Regions:
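Beta-propeller blade termini and top-face loops
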Residues: 1-174
Length: 174
């Protein structure tokens, strides 16, 4: 449906603001409704629709705060990956196999394999517990497959991971 549009809004990074979250339009952007909001400190960084089922939507919410001279806070208790199976009406936080906020969970970048929607990859910023993770059950559970921080070490800045459009076993990170 080309009239259905989703937007991830991080909000400004210098303090709390109510504009953060995931928004949806069902009329091509004429009107918007906020469909996922955690709090005024947690913004949405990414929203992705399953390429094979438009009712399944994932969103990365990140509680990050920029301070003066780069002394911000880059993780917060509400950071995480969220999944909706009903077009964005309800959301569930995906936690199985992912680092916790107590372990330093920050920003997540993720992708869905176009050839197999059950296969997902994510770069997870979480200090020693971070890395590149893989899910084989559409985000319900995750396994860390790479710990070398050269592949994911600036996840709070970039958090990019992509899967090859023809081969779900090939993944790229930046």
């Amino acid at each position: 449906d080309e009239n259905k549009v989703f937007v991830a809004a991080l909000g400004h990074p210098y303090g709390p603001n109510e504009e953060r979250g995931v928004y949806r339009s069902i009329n091509g952007g004429k009107n918007w409704e906020k469909i996922l909001f955690i709090d005024e400190n947690t913004g949405a960084v990414q929203v992705t629709i399953d390429p094979n089922n438009s009712n399944i939507i994932f969103a990365d919410l990140w509680a990050g705060r920029q301070g003066p001279w780069e002394n911000g806070a880059w993780n917060g208790k509400e950071s995480g990956l969220f999944k909706s199976t009903d077009g964005g009406n309800t959301w569930k936080k995906m936690t199985k196999g992912l680092p916790t906020t107590e372990q330093g969970l920050g920003r997540i970048g993720f992708c869905i394999a176009p050839t197999d929607s059950k296969r997902m990859y994510a770069t997870v910023d979480a200090g020693r517990e971070g890395g590149i993770f893989r899910s084989d059950d559409a985000g319900e559970s995750w396994t860390r497959i790479q710990t070398d921080n050269r592949y994911w070490g600036r996840a709070s800045d970039f958090a990019e991971v992509k899967v090859d459009p023809k081969n779900a076993d090939i993944v790229y990170s930046a």
